[in-house]
Amino acid sequence: MSNVLELTIPASTANLGVGFDSIGMALDKFLHLSVKETSGTKWEYIFHDDASKQLPTDETNFIYHVAQQVASKYSVDLPNLCIEMRSDIPLARGLGSSASALVGAIYIANYFGDIQLSKHEVLQLATEIEGHPDNVAPTIYGGLIAGYYNDVSKETSVAHIDIPDVDVIVTIPTYELKTEASRRALPQKLTHSEAVKSSAISNTMICALAQHNYELAGKLMQQDGFHEPYRQHLIAEFDEVKTIASQHNAYATVISGAGPTILIFSRKENSGELVRSLNSQVVSCHSELVDINISGVKERIVYQ
């Protein structure tokens, strides 16, 4: 097979404050993969951006590992492949870079192993590997999605929510924050009353989004009790960014995923001025407007 598989895979932001490990939204920053068979004796990698050049090129490569895991599950053998990669999703910043790579790996195994997975099956596989659907679901489908993974039945359920009519700003620090380190900051247990309170806030926030009530949704996004209070101290710039966003009447300022990126829901009439203020005042970060992605992963076959 000499055909080339081309994948364009969006970034994602998870949690939206109170939707811990459940809610995610796709963003227009992308991992681009171009994959074809090689006559070599092992998988080959060509990286076109500096961040990707940090990645391993042996069997510990994440895409290789996941693709082989999927191939093994369906009892198929994959040929040796050459993967060209370019990404504008920063690594370990809370923008779903690992979820994008995971989804890409499943698509690679599916095509070159001729597995014929449905998109529903891709979601089930991705969530089983990832452990929760908050990043992988919007990466696959696009848009804003709430989901739940039942780790007993191994079944994932998702619900699509209307795209918010807001401008999205991401403030990206220069440093990484590994998900594992961010999760270590979380408590092992919450009291029953704490869990009930946070669940009620999350439920109401989702309803507010569905009703396009961004004032209420934003207010509730900032009242999380599951993870934000335990992670904010890991992000030195969080309080300053939130203060500046509030001065520009933003709807909400929350941690994107496990951090350190900070996500802002902004009023459209204020977003440009807000981004410029953030870039002039919070010089240790880069802030930018980013569109909500509505397409999810895109697959294209180039026949040769």
Curated annotation (Swiss-Prot):
Record-listed E.C. numbers: 2.7.1.39
Which keywords accompany this UniProt record? Amino-acid biosynthesis, ATP-binding, Cytoplasm, Kinase, Nucleotide-binding, Threonine biosynthesis, Transferase
Q: What is known about what this protein does?
A: Catalyzes the ATP-dependent phosphorylation of L-homoserine to L-homoserine phosphate.
Q: Which InterPro entries match?
A: GHMP_kinase_C_dom, GHMP_kinase_C_sf, GHMP_kinase_N_dom, GHMP_knse_ATP-bd_CS, Homoserine_kinase, Ribosomal_Su5_D2-typ_SF, Ribsml_uS5_D2-typ_fold_subgr
Q: Pathway, per Swiss-Prot/TrEMBL?
A: Amino-acid biosynthesis; L-threonine biosynthesis; L-threonine from L-aspartate: step 4/5
Q: Which catalytic reaction applies to this protein? A: L-homoserine + ATP = O-phospho-L-homoserine + ADP + H(+)
Q: What is this protein called?
A: Homoserine kinase
Note whether Electron transport occurs among the keywords. Answer: no
Q: Where in the cell is it found?
A: Cytoplasm
Query: What does the sequence similarity comment in the record state about its family?
Result: Belongs to the GHMP kinase family. Homoserine kinase subfamily.
Q: Which residues bind ATP?
A: P90, L91, A92, R93, G94, L95, G96, S97, S98, A99, S100
Among PANTHER family, the record links this protein to: HOMOSERINE KINASE, HOMOSERINE/4-DIPHOSPHOCYTIDYL-2-C-METHYL-D-ERYTHRITOL KINASE
Single GO MF descriptor: ATP binding
Annotated GO CC locations: cytoplasm
- Which Gene Ontology biological process is one annotated for this entry? threonine biosynthetic process
